[in-house]
Amino acid sequence: KLKLENFLIKNKKKISCIILRYFNVAGVDKKLRCGFYTKKGSNLILNLCFALKKKNIFTVNGNDYETRDGTPIRDYIHVQDLAEIHLLAAKKILKKNFFKIFNCGYGHGYSVMEILKKFNFYSNSKIRYVIGKRRKNDIVISIADPKKIIQFLKWRPKHQNLEHVVKSSLKWYLKHI
């Protein structure tokens, strides 16, 4: 991703494009037709679903970060909002040639423990967890600044409610994993 982005930046006078930098994509489409799936990775929401479905113990990687509850904070953008951003960007670039880079997120975040608690609440279950070591080079807080994308594309977030993200993820993932 970085190599391609650097190539585009280097050639921005010759290429018309919009670069969309995703933050943490979450949720599934409203008709529950598709969702993100991988057997291995660092996707918190998917890993919580695995822990819930398989009754595994979930590892919280560190609780001594300089955050409100000691766990890392991330900006989660719902996949439906991200799809709308893509449509708006495509319409815009068809009308005029330019080069823009946008952060795709909401401008606020949730900690690992906040997400875990929401999963426990909405699943009516209790994901067992242990506190593990910090991940090497983990970013403490990663939150997008969406001002440019809101202004330029006239985008308005519609699905930034954490309840919607968690409930839709639970419905889809627990059926498909």
Indicate where each model-derived feature is located.
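Short-chain dehydrogenase/reductase
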Residues: 1-2, 34-46, 75-76, 109
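Active-site Tyr-X1-5-Lys
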Residues: 1-28, 46-55
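Short alpha-helix within the catalytic core of nucleotide-sugar-dependent glycosyltransferases
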Residues: 9, 45, 83, 87
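Flexible, glycine-rich beta-alpha linker
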Residues: 15-43, 66-71
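C-terminal substrate-binding subdomain of Rossmann-fold SDR/epimerase-dehydratase oxidoreductases
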Residues: 50-177
